[in-house]
Amino acid sequence: MDNERIKDLGEKELIIRLSKYMPKNQTKDDCASLSIAHENLLINTDLMVEDTHFNDKIIHPKDLGWKSVTTNYSDLISSGCVEFIGINVGLIINPETKWHWIKEFYEGAYEALDYYGGVILGGDCSKGIKNGISITAIGLQGKLSLRRYSSRPEEIIITTGTHGLSRLGYLLKRNKTNKDLSKLSGKLISQSLNSFQRPKPKRDFLQNIIKSRLSTDQIEIGCTDSNDGFYQAV
């Protein structure tokens, strides 16, 4: 086992092995819930690496800044976040990167925070061969506890959007659809590119969940973000 490499394990197996060092169910959701002074904090971290998750050929740095915030925000609201406090930004930057790229990235992040609430709380940076971005988002949990492990067999699954649009947008940007683009409507292409480059989590999601409850005593509901795909989410 000492000779095993991470690339041979895969993400799922790595998480399973690391979960034994964490509290029960800690790896079941995208956010950790911490009780502090009668409030629960929701904390989520996403990491993106150049040429693995992004590059300048498929996404503009301003769109990348927006997306970095909104993907984290989506994780928070799907865990019951009622107030988006803000983000910490960790950057690994190649010394040859132009300032303009960094500026555009932060402008995109600021636009997203201006739209959804929250501020840039701080962060850190270092140099590396390829650019990397780590965003830690923090929010306050409301009365509802939305956790993936609260789901039960035979319950109805409800989604808040159309799955596959972001993936199609990604493939379109990379010219890897293997499809005749003339068969795709202009509306579908536009929706797919917007979903990939400028995803917009639904801010009224939590309020709609509250309205749909059969009982006001029900505080735990099975829920998760599906940024990684519907199959992965369930």
Regions found by a protein language model. Name each.
Residues 1-234:
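Helix-biased detector of long, well-ordered alpha-helical tracts
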